[in-house]
């Protein structure tokens, strides 16, 4: 590949012991994800979120550089998030950490995968208990 080592960076995060009300609040999650994208320096293109009954939210923020997604399970205090950024200008960990803080996640586990390089190699794995 020409000037980049990868086509992109993909952070997959497991967030546990999150605030129930925040995990179930679609407007809050939508704004949190837009703010996370902007904080990381991304350009927001489109936003789509859905509130499930009786609880839970799924959504995506499309950015010029790729996307941020969430699937929340308030009854378990759990959220599954992905932050994928193309190129090397934006650090997806900035957005992922902002989201974890915003959901008051007490336990976090994440991996970062380089995309577009062929075989997968896990570059980062961390668990934080607060």
From Swiss-Prot:
Query: Keywords in UniProt for this one?
Result: Autocatalytic cleavage, Decarboxylase, Lyase, Polyamine biosynthesis, Pyruvate, S-adenosyl-L-methionine, Schiff base, Spermidine biosynthesis, Zymogen
Query: What organism does the record attribute this protein to?
Result: Bacillus cereus (strain ATCC 14579 / DSM 31 / CCUG 7414 / JCM 2152 / NBRC 15305 / NCIMB 9373 / NCTC 2599 / NRRL B-3711)
Q: Which HAMAP family match?
A: AdoMetDC_1
Question: What name does the UniProt record give this protein?
Answer: S-adenosylmethionine decarboxylase proenzyme 1
InterPro entries listed in its UniProt record: AdoMetDC_C (IPR042286), AdoMetDC_fam_prok (IPR003826), AdoMetDC_N (IPR042284), S-AdoMet_deCO2ase_core (IPR016067), S-AdoMet_deCOase_pro-enz (IPR017716)
Summarizing the function annotation, the protein's role is: Catalyzes the decarboxylation of S-adenosylmethionine to S-adenosylmethioninamine (dcAdoMet), the propylamine donor required for the synthesis of the polyamines spermine and spermidine from the diamine putrescine.
Encoding gene per record: speH1
Q: Which family does it belong to?
A: Belongs to the prokaryotic AdoMetDC family. Type 1 subfamily.
What's its EC? 4.1.1.50
């Amino acid at each position: 590949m020409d000037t980049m080592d990868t086509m992109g960076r993909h952070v997959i995060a497991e967030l546990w012991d999150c605030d129930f009300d925040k995990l179930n609040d679609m407007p809050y999650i939508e704004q949190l994800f837009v703010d996370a994208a902007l904080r990381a320096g991304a350009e927001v293109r489109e936003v789509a979120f859905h509130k499930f009954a009786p609880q839970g939210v799924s959504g995506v923020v499309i950015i010029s550089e790729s996307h941020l997604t969430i699937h929340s399970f308030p009854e378990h205090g759990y959220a599954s998030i992905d932050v994928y950024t193309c190129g090397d200008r934006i650090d997806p960990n900035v957005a992922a950490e902002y989201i974890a803080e915003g959901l008051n996640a007490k336990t976090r586990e994440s991996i970062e995968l380089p995309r577009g390089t062929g075989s997968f190699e896990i570059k980062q794995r961390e668990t934080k208990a607060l």
